[in-house]
Amino acid sequence: MQETILNKIIKDKIDWIKYRKKIQPLIKFKNKINKETRNFYNSLKEKRPFFILECKKSSPSLGIIRKKFNLIEIANIYKNYASAISVLTDEKYFHGNIEYINVVRRCVSQPILCKDFFIDSYQVYLARYYSADAILLMLSVLNDSQYLELSRIAKELNMGVLTEINNIKELKRAIKLNASVIGINNRNLHDLSIDLNRTRTLSPLIKNKIIVSESGIKKNHQIKELSNIVHGFLIGSSLMYRTNLETNIKSLIIGDNKVCGLTRIIDAKIVESCGAVYGGLIFADNSLRKTNEKIAEKMIFENNLRFIGVFQNQDIEKIVNIAQRLSLYAVQLHGSENQKYINILRKKLCKKIKIWKAFSIQSTLPLLNWDHIDKYIFDSGSGGTNKTFNWSILKGSILENVILAGGINTDNVLIASQLNCSGLDFNSGVEKSPGIKDHKKISLIFKKLTF
């Protein structure tokens, strides 16, 4: 029988523990352990859904995930979004280190979860000695007596426990063992495949426990769906392999949201700080919110938003010139541009600049099969009309590559967010007057979007 990855990890973990006990005997540090911890359980009760964000450099399935693994930089971003922070400490398979816990903990106020393959009481003491506030106990590698012993020690040290399960058998054990927080790992620990149906199948069977969905969470629509059946998420790999960490956290947790019609630098800064991923700069000639290139250039320089240039039936050379000079993230076509026009634009435009296409929705939806279009905008008109179209026609459609626009405001944003689009596009609904954004409305909308 072929040895599984999990079996290999556990064999090597036994060797690591033997070695660590020799170089750092428990007797040398047990009396130095501080039992004052940050309450892991309380931190998971403060928000729904909550997020346990993970510091992970490598994994057996993906290899090196994050080459530039700056723990301080990661922690200072995570602290703005996480209820707790997970730190991978396994050395051989995840390139972690027990000393990473203190590095992260000094940067944040949240509890730190030590994520490792716990099989020996020594590891629990070691984790607390290095300031972990909670540990992960996996029922796939522990029998009931081992689990009870490790969780008993954790309780003595005022540490929380995240109990991980992978199937119905382990779930029944977790309930019998009176686990307070149950993590459903969507990853098969033997072949490392991922199946979100584990969460969908197992979570309805869990009553009066805090439920965490672990592994495989990559898109905001998954969070929206699973938030109906779990309380929070543990997310690592899908964030760690991205270059712009904070932008991708916003995209994952809040959605691919955009505020369009920006004309002032101060508005762009508020939009970014509230959680938007994209900022829209309108260059269409007939728009009340048209910006000029000098202001746009300064806005882009001073903000980390992904800026989208909005054009309408304009000369291709002009679009290419503006987009490339400003290093726009994408060009949004908001007119009657046809496939031939788009083909020419794609040939002339720098490859890294994406092309989005907006549609004015009436009674039917367009086919989303255009060549060279990276994202679609469903709007109620030519933009900035403060009117919605009939959203009921979206029911049953696959909208993972669609941003919803048109008349979205503080009153209807929650309804809009449940339509399963990849994000929302705000304009007149967050304004005092055309091009002048209302900071209170923007703040309120993004507070609502963060559940």
UniProtKB/Swiss-Prot annotation:
<comment type="function">
    <text>Bifunctional enzyme that catalyzes two sequential steps of tryptophan biosynthetic pathway. The first reaction is catalyzed by the isomerase, coded by the TrpF domain; the second reaction is catalyzed by the synthase, coded by the TrpC domain.</text>
</comment>
<keyword id="KW-0511">Multifunctional enzyme</keyword>
<comment type="pathway">
    <text>Amino-acid biosynthesis; L-tryptophan biosynthesis; L-tryptophan from chorismate: step 4/5.</text>
</comment>
<feature type="region of interest" description="Indole-3-glycerol phosphate synthase">
    <location>
        <begin position="1"/>
        <end position="256"/>
    </location>
</feature>
<keyword id="KW-0822">Tryptophan biosynthesis</keyword>
<comment type="pathway">
    <text>Amino-acid biosynthesis; L-tryptophan biosynthesis; L-tryptophan from chorismate: step 3/5.</text>
</comment>
<dbReference type="InterPro" id="IPR013798">
    <property type="entry name" value="Indole-3-glycerol_P_synth_dom"/>
</dbReference>
<dbReference type="GO" id="GO:0004640">
    <property type="term" value="F:phosphoribosylanthranilate isomerase activity"/>
</dbReference>
<dbReference type="GO" id="GO:0000162">
    <property type="term" value="P:L-tryptophan biosynthetic process"/>
</dbReference>
<dbReference type="InterPro" id="IPR011060">
    <property type="entry name" value="RibuloseP-bd_barrel"/>
</dbReference>
<dbReference type="InterPro" id="IPR001240">
    <property type="entry name" value="PRAI_dom"/>
</dbReference>
<dbReference type="Pfam" id="PF00218">
    <property type="entry name" value="IGPS"/>
</dbReference>
<feature type="region of interest" description="N-(5'-phosphoribosyl)anthranilate isomerase">
    <location>
        <begin position="257"/>
        <end position="451"/>
    </location>
</feature>
<keyword id="KW-0057">Aromatic amino acid biosynthesis</keyword>
<comment type="similarity">
    <text>In the N-terminal section; belongs to the TrpC family.</text>
</comment>
<dbReference type="InterPro" id="IPR013785">
    <property type="entry name" value="Aldolase_TIM"/>
</dbReference>
<comment type="similarity">
    <text>In the C-terminal section; belongs to the TrpF family.</text>
</comment>
<dbReference type="Pfam" id="PF00697">
    <property type="entry name" value="PRAI"/>
</dbReference>
<comment type="subunit">
    <text>Monomer.</text>
</comment>
<dbReference type="GO" id="GO:0004425">
    <property type="term" value="F:indole-3-glycerol-phosphate synthase activity"/>
</dbReference>
<keyword id="KW-0210">Decarboxylase</keyword>
<keyword id="KW-0456">Lyase</keyword>
<keyword id="KW-0413">Isomerase</keyword>
<protein>
    <recommendedName>
        <fullName>Tryptophan biosynthesis protein TrpCF</fullName>
        <ecNumber>4.1.1.48</ecNumber>
        <ecNumber>5.3.1.24</ecNumber>
    </recommendedName>
</protein>
<dbReference type="InterPro" id="IPR045186">
    <property type="entry name" value="Indole-3-glycerol_P_synth"/>
</dbReference>
<keyword id="KW-0028">Amino-acid biosynthesis</keyword>
<dbReference type="InterPro" id="IPR001468">
    <property type="entry name" value="Indole-3-GlycerolPSynthase_CS"/>
</dbReference>
